[in-house]
């Protein structure tokens, strides 16, 4: 059984893995980013930090999009969305719906994209979780989403 210090330490190590993973994304080293995020996810799972696990899983989906692996991205998004539903995190659901909508949009599936963007807006408007921690997650998601959009524009 882990004590509070061990859980805190494990949580911090997971956060550090994520910070380095985002740096890997900046360097376009997506394989390394995936490895680091998976390490962070394993650590979070071991201490039962469900919400952060779902947030990082959503980020892993974004990195898979950068690697053009839509099926793995959707797997991550759907698991993250299901977890967000279970823990009743409207802010996290908004983030996931937004990412799914972006994926659908890039595939030209505009009707599905619009539905997801509407769900994202509705969830965010109803969220009471607009805390600093949520803001940090939105900043990470936003940064990686910009990287994805830049990549798709360059490929067009």
Where are these regions (language model features)?
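Residue register of alpha-helical TPR repeats
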Residues: 15, 55, 95, 135-136
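Residue signature of alpha-solenoid helical repeat architecture, marking inter-repeat boundaries
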Residues: 8-12, 51, 91, 132
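Amphipathic alpha-helical segments of tetratricopeptide repeats
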Residues: 2-3, 39-43, 81-85, 89, ...
